[in-house]
Amino acid sequence: MSSAVFSLHLRVKPAVLIDARNITPDRFAGRELSELRNIVVLEGGRKTRLSELFDIDGPEKAPSDPGQVTIVFETGSDKLCFIGYRMSKGRIVVKGDAGHLVGYRMRGGSIVVEGSARDYVGAKMRDGTIEVYGSVGHRVGGKLPGEKPGKGMKGGTIAVRGNAGSEAGFGMERGVIIIEGSAGNLVGADMLGGSVVVKGDCGLYPGAGMSGGRVVVGGRVGAILPSFYADSMVPSISVRGIKLDKPFMLFIGDVVVGGKGLLYVSYDDNRELLSYYKSLIEEEGVEV
């Protein structure tokens, strides 16, 4: 069977949070359209049928392979949570905003949010791609409260065209997060591995508690922890084909946890903050 597209239109604007974790290509695969309309969705903790919240258009039966299923939310809402939960294949498109936990525990496939999304986008994901055209909330690609470092994102790619809240990449182990705009405090806190690239500014203390991985700040930084030591200057940096062609100062840390994480901070955007560090390290042929 060829690929199939299912379009979902919200009947009314949601007043409470909707748990949409059952709306995935994996759940749709191999089911009749009549079965899909009866999928259970939680509306404010109350069980309801998918057809009570959405009008559904699509073929009479979904392909048995989730990779051939595309789900399009024709109307988005910041109340739609858990979109793409544990999906392994296929594609989800949200034509608008999305709520918390988009792509939570995602294992593959792709999610595109054409608006903004709330907290925990891609939290604990293992593979796949998430692209958000707008901004995202806190802990994109992160772990949950109380979990140990390394329990966050374990693979895949998250691209955010707008800004991100605090603690982007919190506790991540692998994978790549690219933020085109700015980010809040504690980018890459408790990281074990992976990469977080913030092309714009970030808040206080990027990399706090990190023991591995890489954080890149292409704009201004609020402050750097004293438990990071300046290592060297580099003329530019590339991450997954994205090249930031300007000088960066490389810091190593967080030594409080015996960390060997890499923190790259744009020199030109932080001359006042970094001039002292520059005097402590040996330049490697970079004019600054």
Predicted regions: what they are:
Residues 75, 89-90, 94:
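LRR N-terminal entry segment and analogous cap-like coil->beta motifs
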